From Swiss-Prot:
UniProt name for this protein: MATH domain and coiled-coil domain-containing protein At3g58250
Keyword list, A-Z: Coiled coil
Entries under PROSITE patterns matching the protein: MATH
Stretches assigned to coiled coil: 231-287
Pfam families according to UniProt: MATH_2
Every MATH domain range: 8-135
Highest taxon listed in the record's lineage: Eukaryota
Length: 303
């Protein structure tokens, strides 16, 4: 296992004794690409009771140590190496936003297990399976796992190179955002900027992904930032809109539940009424049916 020195965007993982593995899931060693710490997660028997494929995912390592609201956008590919020259390796590629709620992503059905384990497949050599992952980190929100050697100055704020482009665009769109910010300590300035970036990321998320606690924390952060001189009327407006949508969502779900209960009662009543109707129909049919000759000997005296 280890980084491919010829290409720092790649990592190779060799799984030994693949066919005889008993573990449901296994992890690779951690590795660093583009300042982010990763690891691979594999399910040798498939990540599904019905699966007959190798399942493989890219996982953000030590994600619990990253700040609230962290996200990273990455394009990556998995290659299952075939060692027979005339046969093709299996490669799949995808792109994903990794975040607190979804810190791993990949393919549940990567390659059929029967194909991997076939004697002449070329994928297993002495029982070893080689996987190569190639990653291109497109954007990072929140701190990296690995410190970058240099920070960049954007309007007096020291930010990571991966954050610089976004922070520059933020000042271009809102040039007066920090004109009244008076704190001089660079560590504190960087801290407040990171809080602002996390707050913006919270507002950008779908209301369905945001909890009431997230909103409460967001308003506390907003108040702290504005108290220290940030001009964030536009951000408060966005946060209020998210809150309104969240309230509408909650009200709508409550009403849906109420309507569902009412509908259940109505269906039960309809079922009872249908049963009563069927009974009345049967009684009516019985009432209008002609009397037979054997009915209680009523017609015996006439014959």
């Amino acid at each position: 296992m280890g980084n491919d020195q010829a290409d720092k965007k790649k990592f190779s993982w060799v799984i030994k004794n693949f066919s005889s593995l008993q573990s449901e899931k296994i992890y690779s060693d951690q590795f660093v690409i583009d300042g982010c710490r990763w690891r691979l997660l594999a399910f040798p028997k498939g990540n599904d009771t019905k699966s007959d494929h190798l399942s493989l995912y890219l996982d953000v390592a030590e994600s619990e140590s990253l700040p609230c609201g962290w996200r990273r956008h990455a394009q990556f590919s998995f290659t299952i190496v075939n060692h027979i020259p005339e046969k093709c390796s299996q490669r799949k590629e995808t792109i994903h936003w990794f975040c607190e709620k979804v810190s791993d992503w990949g393919f549940t059905n990567l390659v059929p297990l029967i194909e991997l384990k076939a004697e002449d497949s070329g994928f297993l050599v002495k029982g070893e399976l080689k996987i190569v992952v190639e990653i291109e980190v497109l954007e990072v929100i929140g701190l990296l796992n690995v410190s970058e050697s240099e920070s960049m100055d954007v309007n007096g704020f020291h930010v990571l190179p991966s954050q610089a482009k976004y922070v520059k665009s933020l000042f271009e769109i809102h040039p007066d955002i920090a004109t009244k910010f008076r704190i001089k300590n660079q560590y504190l300035k960087t801290g407040y900027m990171n809080v602002l970036l996390c707050l913006i990321e919270t507002v950008r998320r779908s209301p369905k992904e945001i909890s009431k606690n997230d909103l409460a924390d967001a308003y506390v952060a907003l108040e702290s930032l504005t108290d220290h001189g940030f001009k964030l009327d536009w951000l408060k407006k966005k946060l209020d809109q998210v809150t309104q949508k969240k309230e509408k969502e909650a009200a709508g779900e409550t009403r849906m539940h109420e309507i569902g209960e009412e509908l259940k009662d109505l269906k039960l009543k309809c079922s009872d009424l249908e049963a009563q109707l069927d009974k009345e129909k049967a009684d009516v049919l019985a009432a209008i049916a002609p009397l037979g000759s054997s009915d209680d000997g009523v017609f015996d005296d006439f014959f």
